[in-house]
């Protein structure tokens, strides 16, 4: 799905790179952004709308892009909610969709049950029952964006902001 080589292109087709997105390996080239490499690999949808869970893909090319939030790396260098249109591809990059990467396939499985799950259904169904402790984690994982970093960042920084 790549466009033809152009003389003004910033992409160097002689330097292939490999990266991982949502636990799948892909190939790109030096000069690609994460978004352009995903589109070139035919990954057109990698986010979900907040309210209805509709598929979202790239509609812009820069900072104005609203749908391209991804989380980079793993461990202490985990960085949530970065825009895929602003991330230059590098060899070994690891990224996941910020709008709950696991829910993209899972939501497709539970789509037939949507008519039984109106907004807030879990408050009426599970809150006052013992089942809530079992169901709560799974329901919360279906909503919201990315997770907070859970490990310590081992990098050294010259400035520390202690007011946060």
List each language-model region with its residue ranges.
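Short, structural beta-strand-to-alpha-helix junction motif
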Residues: 33-35
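Ubiquitin-like/PB1-type beta-grasp interaction modules and other compact soluble beta-rich domains
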Residues: 1-30, 41-80
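Carbohydrate-associated surface elements
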Residues: 38
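Fe-S ferredoxin-like electron-transfer domains
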Residues: 50-164
């Amino acid at each position: 799905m790549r466009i033809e080589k152009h003389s003004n292109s910033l992409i160097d087709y002689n330097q292939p790179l490999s990266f991982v997105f949502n636990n799948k390996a892909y190939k790109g080239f030096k000069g690609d952004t994460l978004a352009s490499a995903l589109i070139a690999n035919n990954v057109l949808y990698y986010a979900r709308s907040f309210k209805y869970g509709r598929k979202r893909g790239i509609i812009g090319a820069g900072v104005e892009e609203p749908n391209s939030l991804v989380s980079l790396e793993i461990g202490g260098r985990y960085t949530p909610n970065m825009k895929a249109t602003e991330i230059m591809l590098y060899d070994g990059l690891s990224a996941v969709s910020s709008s709950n990467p696991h829910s993209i396939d899972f939501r497709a499985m539970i789509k037939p049950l949507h008519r039984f799950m109106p907004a807030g259904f879990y408050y009426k169904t599970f809150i006052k029952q013992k089942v809530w402790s079992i169901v709560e984690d799974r329901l919360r994982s279906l909503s919201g964006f990315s997770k907070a970093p859970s490990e310590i960042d081992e990098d050294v920084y010259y400035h520390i902001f202690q007011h946060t």
